Amino acid sequence: EIMPSLVGSEMCIRDSNNGQGKTNLLEAIWLLTGGKSFRGGKDAELVRRGEPFAVLEASTLRAQQEEQEPDEPNRVRLTVGTPDSQRPGRYASVNGAAPRRAAGLAGSFPAVVFDPGHLSLVKGAPEGRRKFLDAALCQLYPGYLTVYRRYLRALQQKNALLRRSPAGQERPYAEKMALLEVLNTELAAQGEAIQQRRRAYLERLAPLACANYEELSHGAERMELRYAAQFEPGGLAALLKARQNEEVRAGQSLCGPHREDLELLLDGQPARVFASQGQQRSVVLSLKMAEAAAAAAITGEHPVLLLDDVLSELDDGRKQYLLTRMREKQTFVTSCDDTAFLKTDGEVYRMNGGVLSKI
């Protein structure tokens, strides 16, 4: 048990060297959301080398808990097993209930994480920006994860069907087209739901993010967020039918929400092409602060902020902006830089060899 009880406050964690366990702590807190590690990689990489599994135990207290007394926390036990263990993967038990897949925690512990790797949101591939939207939606609307998984399952089946099979193993054409029609029907239903949720969320997120950017840049540029859709609402089924022969020739799916993008613009120009390093940081910081504010507006509850070594990536102006916004909600922030915490009112801890101690 290395963490004190912190409610509605800032917790700053520092060390003089990398590799002492700061990020591991934030990663452990993030896993309570039901999401995968924000650093990527496989679940098995969360387990200490040579061990069959890892265990995380925590108590969380939400601002609104309808089924419990106001001061009664949720006791969460999360296990991560390697492929060779008795229970591979991530499983979670809440208040002594039977373990279930950790993804079932979605929505029970709201959090927003920001680490230097998120700068790729601007100049990286569209997949990263789609994941940004989908991860936020999974926390806000637990049912979204079910829809998203159904879509991915149908998409995987469709791509397997479209792939050219070895000679002599190809399905009869009529059978292939019949299966394709069934899968396209499922993709149209789930894909429409995915796009509808993304569009609605973006309507809330965009004004917040753009206002944040204007404040950060002192009005130097105007930021815009635009959903780059392949189809209008209600039009996915027709699009899938129209491009069916093209997909058969290509051997893969070519349309749907998995091919769409979130465009980030500065003064009408694509940020992925023209944004400087400083502008990229401002865009991502604006998005992450907007993600937290949108979650608070939708749920009535501020998510926990997890900021992993991002202060050192920011200039003084952006750093002061972030430190000011940190005061609005519970925040865990890590840094190797002592000066990063000079202007914070939060409690400061040192992490050394995985051991946390108050300074």
Model-derived regions, located:
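Single conserved hydrophobic/aromatic residue that forms the stacking wall/gate
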Residues: 1-13
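Conserved ABC ATPase signature
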Residues: 17-20, 234-287, 312
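Walker B catalytic acidic pair
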Residues: 308-310
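Loop/turn-to-beta-strand initiation segments
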Residues: 110, 301-303, 327-332
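An accessory alpha-helical subdomain
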Residues: 114-217, 228-231
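Phosphate-binding glycine-rich loops of NTP-binding sites
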Residues: 10, 14-45, 276-291
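Nucleotide-state sensing region of NTPase/ATPase domains
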Residues: 33-128, 132-140, 144, 206, ...
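C-terminal lobe/lid and adjacent interdomain/linker elements of RecA-like ASCE P-loop ATPase modules
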Residues: 64, 81, 317-359
